[in-house]
């Protein structure tokens, strides 16, 4: 691409710089072509991260980190895609929260008892809770997603409430659980 030039590589990444006047659609077109060529030549689909615009060479490290964060988020989504960090602000916030001790404590306070129970007894309560929160407490959709009979789901929900002390009929509790699960996904990457 005439407005893109290669600036370096690491074992699992490469870097491109674009001129300031290039449109996002042109960057996307160029990245899709790179993705296609890598697949054609090496048989591998890659996730590409694109940082925000920088105005000084002093910002290269920050831009590199933002692009790497975009890649991490893209991989977490389970897709091999082109990820612009500017389109991933909420996920970026979760990624950053996962680094903070206060959020680690928040996650532990919310889920530690359940995680320990699942590990000790081989129960699927954490996954059940995650799915219930993703479906905003809708029991029918949760049961269908987990391929469970509604009575089995009702039993699991009662046990989860007993173990956590949480009221899973409360929308605020489900919101909190959903938030914690999103942060937890990025914490697990850091172990």
Model-derived features: positions:
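Cytosolic nucleotide-utilizing catalytic cores of signal-transduction proteins
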Residues: 1-191
């Amino acid at each position: 691409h005439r407005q893109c030039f290669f600036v370096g590589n690491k074992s699992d990444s490469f870097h491109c710089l674009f001129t300031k006047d290039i449109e996002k659609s042109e960057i996307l077109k160029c990245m899709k072509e790179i993705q296609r060529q890598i697949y054609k030549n090496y048989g591998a689909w890659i996730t590409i991260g694109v940082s925000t615009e920088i105005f000084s060479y002093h910002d290269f490290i920050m831009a590199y980190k933002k692009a790497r964060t975009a890649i991490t988020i893209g991989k977490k989504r389970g897709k091999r895609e082109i990820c612009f960090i500017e389109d991933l602000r909420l996920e970026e916030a979760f990624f950053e929260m996962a680094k903070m001790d206060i959020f680690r404590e928040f996650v532990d306070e919310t889920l530690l008892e359940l995680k320990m129970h699942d590990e000790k007894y081989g129960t699927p309560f954490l996954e059940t809770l995650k799915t219930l929160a993703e479906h905003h407490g809708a029991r029918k959709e949760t049961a269908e997603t987990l391929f469970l009979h509604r009575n089995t789901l009702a039993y699991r929900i009662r046990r989860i409430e007993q173990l956590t002390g949480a009221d899973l009929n409360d929308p605020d509790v489900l919101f909190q659980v959903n938030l914690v699960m999103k942060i937890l996904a990025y914490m697990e990457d850091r172990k």
